[in-house]
Amino acid sequence: PFIKRIRQHFSMVSDNAVPTFPADKPKETLDYIAVLKATGAEMAVRKSFEVVEENTASDHRPLVADLALKTPGGKLMTHEPYLQDPRPDRMTVMFQTDAVCHAWVEFGTDSIHTQRARTIVGGQEACYDIENKIVLHDLKPGHEYYYRVCLVGLTYKRAYETHFGDTLTTRFYKFRTPSDNDTDFTALVFNDLHQNSKAYEALLKKTVGIDYDFVIFNGDCLPEPRDRAHAIRMIHNVTDPVGGAEKPVIFIRGNHEIRDFYSVGMHSLIGYRDGLTYGAFNWGDTRFVVLDLGEDKPDDTWVYYGLNDFTSLRNDQVRFLKEELRSRDFRKAARHILVSHIPVFANTDKYQPCTELYGSLLKGQPFDLALCAHVHETAFYEKGTGGAPFPIFRGGGPSV
């Protein structure tokens, strides 16, 4: 009767058939482990239980239990998803969960007739970590799509035993795929926010009423990530306010993104096209060419402790630029925009390897505009002024 009353409000963990008293020669079960059902973290799986053979520490033998507790459904995901790597025929949905989950995305041209997408790696669903990246394939250019994220917690997963937990389904979000036929679009470009929330809020107020198509964060907007939690927090601090769940976001590395312990870890949280921090993409009839110019000081600067090799990265982009500038996508585009955090031209740093590396390649190319940042001083250079081979707009710093 005693155990029956306990089970009304508790989930039993211990094995009631194993005696625990007296410690030297146990004959009775007087010790129990139980979890209160009202805690909201209901016990899901008892992974192991043991009555320890300890005869002298107490007159009762100690109990040890290893438990796996469910994560409540409402806490499986506490951030919005964000769209990455937008293409006419695909879109990448990225999100982080607060527990490892069986995850998929339901999507379609309406919210009723949907199909399911998930990430399969070598025949297995990728459900071993809180980072999730799901690509929606076979989309039609210039079409509106609806999607939602669906989660089932994985409370316990081993070779021959899997226990599913609570579920969560987000609301439906919507996005529009780009089309090569688009001739007009609007993009928001932010740079050098440096976690200054007041500056970001002031800039966001200027965007009220603007129907934009995508957002570019042109460097130093995710500065110096200390660890994964800090990196995730910074990403959502900038993507959630601009509706990154419905407006694709393009992250460009600045020199502050590549500092601190977790800087390389950022790669798994950002949907870089083809896994590269530089590249090119089309939005409508416009070709964007993106460069990652690395740090603003030489690789052998003492503060880098011999761990950087941005010289190789810049040289790789020489080869990329040569191929890109003669590519069909570049040549057939009606407009061309060059984007980099550190300016190739209009840079005030003492260390300017990129002007020498890329200057001769870029001069004479049909770029309509270059967007850059880094200097923390807003400036516009007409073609032919200050050594600019095409118009250059340089964004300012985070002061308000």
Predicted ranges, named:
Residues 2-75:
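Metal-dependent phosphoester-hydrolase catalytic domains
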Residues 3-26, 30, 35, 132, ...:
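Conserved beta-sheet core of the metallophosphoesterase superfamily
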Residues 39, 58-61, 66-189, 208-210:
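Acidic, histidine-bearing metal-coordination/catalytic regions of metal-dependent phosphoesterases
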